């Protein structure tokens, strides 16, 4: 593909060169025209390129999302280059080839110009002398007009006579004045090729040669000294060109020995005179001025008759033979000499004008293109370095994000397990401590001091205060046993969480973690609710004789079985005999098998049933005992029994009732509290779990904020990298475009500025 592109470029270049050579062969002046068109096109492209570069640099400089990749100085430099290129483009658009004709008065300067233009454009001949500088250039219009110096007024000059009359009537014109003669291009083809012809007054009529040179000669590409072949070069003519040579480096000077047709009258002296003129002119150009080599001097000195050439060309333009009329001998030779001068002049001025008008600007354009290319290369490198840095930062943040996610997952699993272990340990500690406190409940109840009275109203208040005392005492004792250890364990776990998650947070947040994570003073709430728990407690503070029938049965059988025995019924349910044993390896139990307790209940129940059936049973038993021990022992027993009854009855005071009440309450409360041991342990473990989970949740919230910040930074980095990548592409494109413009300038230099080999 690159080979094909290279071949295409080569073909295009060859075609351009061929077209260029064809134009040059057609007219040497086309060389300047094509060069001007080419350089103007290059500067137009250069201006558009610098405008694009300036806009790009300014937008990049003002992009707040980017770190600086260009400087304000670079932006101002490129804007300065833009103004310079625009100024040069305006100058190039006005550039043209300029030839200045100088010589003594009436040497035929205007006639030479008219002969070159194939028409009587400037007044010449007898009675007409040029009294100011005349600048002849083409115009696209169809009417000729004059422009005087310092005025935009167009003065009509349709014919040479009108022009001559206008010039002589204007009294303000002096030798140093400039009048522009704008002549239609359609009438003079030579003017189409950006050629300006400068006619001048005779250099022998003024002493203001220095001001003439400064004003009219510094931008001239070729100087033509029109000399009179009937005399030698005058010192005035030499002096003027010495001054020109001092102000300009190696000016292009042609010497026309005009009126050479006069030599035809003396043919025997023609060659001798020609040789003398050639030697003197060559010596002047080579030895005195040093503007050409001796080998090149022959191409700068010509012997012509401008009047003959002008007349011949006017006749040819009118359709008549150019050799018609009375012509001196040797006309064709002099015509050929004039044509040879024109050819050499055109070649010289086109080469010289291209070099003097375009070379400096071409060099400046190359410098500007190179400067902008270096700026674009600098921007490209800065953007590339910043992109690499952003990619490293993005990768670092991505790694950080992955580390946080992985570490958070591991820590969550670890802390979940540890929280479970701590809650189980808390439940075990609370359950153990509560069981021990229940066993010591009687001590706590005995510590309760309040006036006791068996009336229902006082008992209700007594119970409520006892409930409060029990709940506060149990809570205090449980707190002394468990809270300190549990709180220490919880705080240790919280600190471990903070230490574990702190590395996942930014450095700026780590020092503020204690303020970001709320850590309130934790205390266990045991929530025993003794008033509700013991709401069904029913005290029994009525007097009961210790050896009474009810108390004895209650003592031996317990409250439940004594009630069954005293009520006189048997609620025993006969066990059915299964058809098949539940366990084939074990034989079925016999139907009459009873436990020892059931056997005792059955005996006493039977006895009670017997005594309840008939009062005769008492007499029978009493008679049996009477016969066995005697009446004295029976009387003594009844006496002691009665004394014991009286004693217990007398000692059944309010204090005794209070002790009975507290004993009954301890038994009832112990039974109820045993039922809530598991619940209380679970409740405390749940409180610890909630506290630890809340701490971990707050820490995770801070980690989530860090993750969100990292994700936002990664997204910003991605956007920034995308912008930087676009900047690099644009900067690279503009850098390469500068290289392309440089190659265009090099091609222009090779085609138009380097001398042909």
Swiss-Prot record:
Membrane-side (Mitochondrial intermembrane) residue stretches: 626
Result of altering residue 94 to W: In HMSN6A and CMT2A2A; pathogenic; severely reduced homo-oligomerization; no effect on hetero-oligomerization with MFN1
Outcome following mutation: residue 76 to P: In CMT2A2A; likely pathogenic
Effect of residue 109 to A/T: Does not affect its ability to cluster mitochondria; when overexpressed
PTM summary: Phosphorylated by PINK1. Ubiquitinated by non-degradative ubiquitin by PRKN, promoting mitochondrial fusion; deubiquitination by USP30 inhibits mitochondrial fusion. Ubiquitinated by HUWE1 when dietary stearate (C18:0) levels are low; ubiquitination inhibits mitochondrial fusion.
Ranges where the record places region G1 motif: 103-110
GO process annotations (BP): aerobic respiration; apoptotic process; blastocyst formation; camera-type eye morphogenesis; mitochondrial fusion; mitochondrial membrane organization; mitochondrion localization; negative regulation of Ras protein signal transduction
Region (G5 motif): 288
EC assignment: 3.6.5.-
Annotated residues for binding of GTP: 106-111, 258-261, 305, 307
Molecular functions (GO terms): GTP binding; GTPase activity; ubiquitin protein ligase binding
Stated consequence of mutating residue 376 to I: In CMT2A2A; uncertain significance
Modified residues (Phosphothreonine): 111
Dynamin-type G domain ranges (all copies): 93-342
Tissues/organs with expression: Ubiquitous; expressed at low level. Highly expressed in heart and kidney.
Outcome of swapping residue 105 to M: In CMT2A2A; pathogenic
Consequence recorded when altering residue 236 to M: In CMT2A2A; uncertain significance
Region listing for G2 motif, in residue ranges: 129-130
Enzyme class: hydrolase
Effect of residue 244 to M: In CMT2A2A; uncertain significance
Region (G4 motif): 258-261
Keywords: Apoptosis, Autophagy, Charcot-Marie-Tooth disease, Coiled coil, Disease variant, GTP-binding, Hydrolase, Membrane, Mitochondrion, Mitochondrion outer membrane, Neurodegeneration, Neuropathy, Nucleotide-binding, Phosphoprotein, Transmembrane, Transmembrane helix, Ubl conjugation, Unfolded protein response
Effect ascribed to mutating residue 230 to A: Loss of function in promoting mitochondrial fusion
Role according to the record: Mitochondrial outer membrane GTPase that mediates mitochondrial clustering and fusion. Mitochondria are highly dynamic organelles, and their morphology is determined by the equilibrium between mitochondrial fusion and fission events. Overexpression induces the formation of mitochondrial networks. Membrane clustering requires GTPase activity and may involve a major rearrangement of the coiled coil domains. Plays a central role in mitochondrial metabolism and may be associated with obesity and/or apoptosis processes.
Protein name: Mitofusin-2
